[in-house]
Amino acid sequence: MKALIVLGLVLLSVTVQGKVFERCELARTLKRLGMDGYRGISLANWMCLAKWESGYNTRATNYNAGDRSTDYGIFQINSRYWCNDGKTPGAVNACHLSCSALLQDNIADAVACAKRVVRDPQGIRAWVAWRNRCQNRDVRQYVQGCGV
């Protein structure tokens, strides 16, 4: 009985924490979902962005007190413009989805929304972490050894 309780608590903690992808697992997943070369953006750049935005964590969130918005998920997609969290003033919801969809272990919705973000004129430059950590840098290390 104790073993079942411990197992239940372990499983509960896993579901609360969400999925933190291993580097190569995420690279393969993003490639399968059509991110490599999407709008001219290499898979290595997407991997660099995800590393510095969320640490590959699907449940990452970050509140922005200045505009009272929140960044959600593996790509840290913002509730001011891209998703609806029901609490961000003046939200646009350009991806037409709930922000909670960006926190799922299945990242298909997050990928679809990230593709929507880069179709705007700013492209991948919409992400501050990409500009600060990935732009004009050798990002091959993020996919090295992954066979992608």
UniProtKB/Swiss-Prot annotation:
Disulfide bonds join C24-C146, C48-C134, C83-C99, C95-C113. It is an enzyme of class 3 (hydrolase). CDD domains: LYZ_C (cd16897). It holds the Pfam family Lys. GO terms for cellular component: azurophil granule lumen; extracellular exosome; extracellular region; extracellular space; specific granule lumen; tertiary granule lumen. It comes from the Eukaryota. Residues 19-148 form the C-type lysozyme domain. Its main location: secreted. InterPro entries: Glyco_hydro_22, Glyco_hydro_22_CS, Glyco_hydro_22_lys, Lysozyme-like_dom_sf. Residues 1-18 form the signal peptide. Keywords: Amyloid, Amyloidosis, Antimicrobial, Bacteriolytic enzyme, Disease variant, Disulfide bond, Glycosidase, Hydrolase, Secreted, Signal. SUPFAM superfamilies: Lysozyme-like. It catalyses: Hydrolysis of (1->4)-beta-linkages between N-acetylmuramic acid and N-acetyl-D-glucosamine residues in a peptidoglycan and between N-acetyl-D-glucosamine residues in chitodextrins. GO terms for molecular function: identical protein binding; lysozyme activity. The active site is at E53, D71. It is found in: Secreted. Its EC number is 3.2.1.17. Lysozyme C is capable of both hydrolysis and transglycosylation; it also shows a slight esterase activity. It acts rapidly on both peptide-substituted and unsubstituted peptidoglycan, and slowly on chitin oligosaccharides. Belongs to the glycosyl hydrolase 22 family. Monomer. Lysozymes have primarily a bacteriolytic function; those in tissues and body fluids are associated with the monocyte-macrophage system and enhance the activity of immunoagents. This is Lysozyme C. It comes from Homo sapiens (Human).
